[in-house]
Amino acid sequence: MLSENFSKLCRVEDLTEGIGKRFLVNEIDIALFKIKGEVFALSNVCPHQHSALIYEGFIEDNCVVCPAHGWKFKLKDGKMENGGNGLNSYPVKVIDDIIYIKAEDKSNNW
């Protein structure tokens, strides 16, 4: 059973492997990625100069690299590779090939 706090985003097949997609959920800018069949949801706003470009980043070593200045964030939790706070991450559920995320009004880590 799915909690009412989850929002329906898209079908898994709507995502391209390794390519981010941008969504606005409850006024939160989200970057969604599918890597090896697993789906990850992170804040789309980089803490460095607040660029909303994370969805355009490339994937390297289970991290997304911000295209603006090269900061790396772990896909699983949004933390910076060097241990900094990084990006907010959001719970994802896939039910019958539909992706749902729980994006609540979280303050940014920066």
Region locations from a protein language model:
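Zn-dependent metallo-beta-lactamase
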Residues: M1-L24
